[in-house]
């Protein structure tokens, strides 16, 4: 299969070519992010973030990623070297993609109630997106329908008083 036949997420056209290279290799391998994560001893969310330039793999990650996807490690070493830094916060605002828009909509509709509950339980502060883990699960609802369960797990950071 040539790379020209691979359907790529639109956002990849705005990123350095290494990310299209990674996505193409993932498609050819028929591996999921969960499969790759298992090979790398990482969480699938973190691995997916690497594929969009939102996280920086360390050297051990690069070795495992190149082995998992049968890629030449030197390309990854060059791309993710000392000059690489993640570009977090990709995309349009508000998002146009239906999945991303629904996540945005959740925060628009339920953001203030969530903020209020965080303040009631923890005090004045924020949930870190730096000291953070996220997980996505497929679960069954009460009518046996497929449901998406997203867990956001961030360190609480109180605002400092001075």
Curated annotation (Swiss-Prot):
Top-level taxon: Eukaryota
Kindly state which reaction or reactions the protein catalyses. Answer: cyanate + hydrogencarbonate + 3 H(+) = NH4(+) + 2 CO2
Please name the catalytic residues of this protein. Answer: 102, 105, 128
Alphabetized, the UniProt keywords read: Lyase
User: Which EC number(s) are documented for this chain?
Assistant: 4.2.1.104
Keyword match Lyase:
yes
Q: Which GO terms describe its molecular function?
A: cyanate hydratase activity; DNA binding
Q: Name one GO biological process term.
A: cyanate metabolic process
Does the keyword Cell inner membrane feature in the UniProt annotation? no
> Which Pfam families has this protein been placed in?
Cyanate_lyase
Principal EC category: lyase
Provide the family line. Belongs to the cyanase family.
- Cross-referenced HAMAP family: Cyanate_hydrat (MF_00535)
Function comment: Catalyzes the reaction of cyanate with bicarbonate to produce ammonia and carbon dioxide.
Indicate what this protein is called per its UniProt record.
Answer: Cyanate hydratase
What species does this protein belong to?
Mycosarcoma maydis (Corn smut fungus)
């Amino acid at each position: 299969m040539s790379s020209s036949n691979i359907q790529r997420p639109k956002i990849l056209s705005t990123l350095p070519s290494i990310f299209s290279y990674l996505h193409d290799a993932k498609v050819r391998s028929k591996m999921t992010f969960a499969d790759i994560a298992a090979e790398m001893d990482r969480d699938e969310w973190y691995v997916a973030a690497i594929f969009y330039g939102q996280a920086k793999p360390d050297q051990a990650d690069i070795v495992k990623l190149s082995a998992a996807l049968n890629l030449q490690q030197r390309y990854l070493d060059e791309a993710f070297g000392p000059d690489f830094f993640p570009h977090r916060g990709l995309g349009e605002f508000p998002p146009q993609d239906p999945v991303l828009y629904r996540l945005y909509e959740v925060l628009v509709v339920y953001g203030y109630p969530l903020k209020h509950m965080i303040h009631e339980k923890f005090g004045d502060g924020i949930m870190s997106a730096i000291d953070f883990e996220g997980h996505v699960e497929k679960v069954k609802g009460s009518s046996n329908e497929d449901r998406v369960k997203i867990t956001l797990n961030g360190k609480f950071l109180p605002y400092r008083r001075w």
